[in-house]
């Protein structure tokens, strides 16, 4: 099947959303599939057996330019959300861990900075993240309350001059074992509001513990606990 002279590819796209992509977007989708087949598939089983992330594939992802795909400016590609979702599906087709890594880095972390950060933060942080030179991790989930950010967070943040003091536990922090930049969500003891605190590695006074057993699906996605 083809559309506007560009051959469609099988993406398990039961509702034919791929037809809504432009030719350029379809070419990128095809390039992602080729990368996952030729670069990721041959190495992923060995990493799966060790529950380690295949960092050697990150340069290839940099060449594809798929981090923070739907965001505009500061080095971000400014592509469609539809393309972003379909690329996530292509990553997960070969291994869910790669989709998790990119979703945490380019979606949760870059998205938080893009939507909630200051102009200075966006200008300073997003370009290097779009190039995968700075890897982001994301700390929301907690052992006792899951991801209940609206009212259940138990981790607290207390302002001390120009710094914040965090107290609490986080669980399943995507990319935290090797990430350069971590966003921690915590409740401000001053006003009870949820704050987004962005810290560079290593977070002072913190302790990271790699979980003893990764789940079977995203087995190579390193998501440690943090205290």
Indicate where each model-derived feature is located.
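A structural signal for short hydrophobic beta-strand segments in well-ordered beta-sheet cores
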Residues: 155-158
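A short core secondary-structure module
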Residues: 162-163, 167-208
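Internal helix-loop-helix
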Residues: 63-135, 174-181
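Short secondary-structure junction/hinge motifs that connect adjacent elements
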Residues: 42-64
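Flexible, small-/acidic-enriched active-site or ligand-binding loops
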Residues: 152, 202-227
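Mature N-terminal segment immediately following signal peptide/propeptide cleavage
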Residues: 19-39
């Amino acid at each position: 099947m083809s559309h506007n002279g560009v051959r469609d590819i099988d993406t398990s796209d039961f509702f034919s959303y791929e037809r809504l992509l432009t030719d350029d977007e379809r070419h990128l989708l095809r390039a992602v599939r080729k990368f996952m087949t030729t670069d990721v598939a041959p190495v992923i089983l060995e990493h799966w057996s060790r529950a380690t992330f295949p960092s050697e594939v990150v340069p290839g992802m940099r060449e594809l330019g798929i981090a923070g795909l739907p965001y505009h400016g500061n080095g971000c590609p400014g592509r469609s959300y539809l393309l972003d979702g379909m690329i996530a599906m292509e990553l997960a087709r070969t291994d869910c861990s790669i989709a998790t890594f990119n979703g945490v880095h380019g979606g949760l972390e870059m998205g938080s900075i893009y939507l909630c950060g200051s102009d200075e933060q966006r200008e300073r942080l997003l370009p290097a993240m779009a190039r995968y030179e700075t890897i982001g991790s994301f700390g929301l989930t907690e052992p006792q309350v899951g991801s209940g950010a609206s009212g259940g967070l138990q981790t607290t943040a207390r302002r001390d001059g120009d710094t914040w003091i965090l107290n609490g536990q986080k669980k399943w922090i995507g990319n935290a074992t090797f990430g350069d930049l971590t966003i921690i969500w915590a409740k401000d003891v001053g006003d009870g509001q949820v704050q987004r605190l962005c810290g560079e590695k290593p977070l002072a006074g913190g302790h990271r513990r790699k979980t003893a057993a990764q789940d079977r699906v995203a087995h190579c996605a390193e998501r440690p606990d943090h205290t």
